[in-house]
A protein has these predicted regions:
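A nucleotide- and high-energy phosphate-metabolite-utilizing enzyme signature
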Residues: 2-218
Length: 218
């Protein structure tokens, strides 16, 4: 069997240039904050995940059409499925090319951030025509900015102290869209005071709150 020499390019190894690129930042540092690692790459123009401006324009086109609300929701769901599928495929191609797991999990988290952000904006601008009164936070591993291919998406809706029926309807709209996209979503809705109380009673909740990160909303 042919022996593969160090740095020889094949389907299972990295080229010398790729190795130097990957090792430029210490491995432990890359995994410490993959979300920020990918954000830096975005700002440098090295990686592109979701064209958020185009996504917003396509959503606007859906809601400017003379369709029923049901048809508009179906069109939004269909568009979101395309964005999710295309984004994940691009991440898979990048992973197979660069063999960089830290970039993958960070970029996957950002893809979901941007997708959820687009859905919240659609709800604010068209579905409910009012700003969200809750803060939508990523928690757990997703909050750390690490999202493996089949990981749960853990969300926390930080509700206003005096919330209304419309707030619950807004939350339900987002959750049902995510579920219909085929995503596995763990979620909780609590006020600030309820979060503090829950963190004092449950260590798991406490640690998840330590890793929370804002995605959208108030």
């Amino acid at each position: 069997m042919r022996q593969v020499r160090p740095f020889e390019e094949n389907s299972l190894s990295l080229s010398r240039i790729q190795m130097e690129k990957v090792s430029a930042v210490p491995l432990w540092q890359r995994w410490l904050s993959p979300h920020e690692l990918v954000r830096d790459k975005e700002r440098a123009g090295e990686i592109h995940i979701l064209d958020t401006q185009l996504f917003a324009e396509e959503i606007s086109t859906i809601y400017s059409s003379k369709q029923t609300k049901s048809d508009q929701r179906a069109a939004l769901l269909s568009l979101s499925k395309v964005k999710l599928s295309e984004g994940r495929k691009a991440l898979e191609v990048g992973l197979m090319r660069d063999r960089d797991g830290a970039v993958y999990v960070g970029a996957h988290a950002i893809l979901i951030d941007q997708l959820i952000g687009g859905l919240v904006a659609a709800a604010e601008n068209y579905v409910f025509a009012t700003k969200a009164r809750f803060a939508l936070m990523a928690v757990g591993g997703y909050g750390r900015g690490e999202l493996a291919p089949l990981s749960d998406i853990d969300l926390l809706f930080v509700m206003p102290q005096r919330h209304k029926k419309s707030d619950a309807e807004f939350v339900e709209f987002i959750l049902y869209m995510l579920w219909d996209l085929g995503l596995v979503v763990g979620h909780a809705s609590r006020t600030v005071h309820q979060n503090i109380a829950a963190a004092g009673e449950d260590l798991t909740i406490c640690t998840s709150l330590l890793e929370m990160r804002s995605i959208a909303g108030a």
